[in-house]
Amino acid sequence: MNNPKPQEWKSEELSQGRIIDYKAFNFVDGEGVRNSLYVSGCMFHCEGCYNVATWSFNAGIPYTAELEEQIMADLAHPYVQGLTWLGGEPFLNTGILLPLVKRIRKELPEKDIWSWTGYTWEEMMLETPDKLELLSLIDILVDGRYDRTKRNLMLQFRGSCNQRIIDVQKSLQSGQVVIWDKLNDGKESYEQVKRE
């Protein structure tokens, strides 16, 4: 597993503007019916990562205007709650995601946006302006690297108990991490997170 220094990894130097996959209308990548965009490229290389195929920034296909139109059309369905970004590392693909999130906020402001990241919230607060801008425009962040030694299959939307589901807007307003108020881990899982 790699641990970056603040502002060491820059999207403009790493991202190739590519994605691994786009999956519309799923129920596993966050709350409600969601569309999921898997971006290419990750520098964290977590041991036991279930998505090793996304590590290369050259993997997959180019992100295109046509794909963006499809994402917007799929997101416009009234039963779709929002869009989820996974990878790969979304925050190393700000060149793709910043224009997309700004368009969503303008055209479909009622939709929510979830993102997974290997960065912790505390690391993100020390990151580059593009990453902080992207963070400021999303609703939910699942933070932290996957840690195989803390694996827990009972966790909601996470693989290891060091990862948190963070309400981004409440956290930014309060200046401290605010956990998503719909967190529904089992009692045993909660006690494990609390101990750490």
Where are these regions (language model features)?
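N-terminal [4Fe-4S]-dependent radical SAM core
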Residues: 1-38, 51-57, 177, 184-193
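Cysteine-centered iron-sulfur cluster-binding motifs in ferredoxin-type domains/subunits
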Residues: 34-49, 89
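Conserved Radical SAM active-site core
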Residues: 14-20, 33, 51-115, 119-134
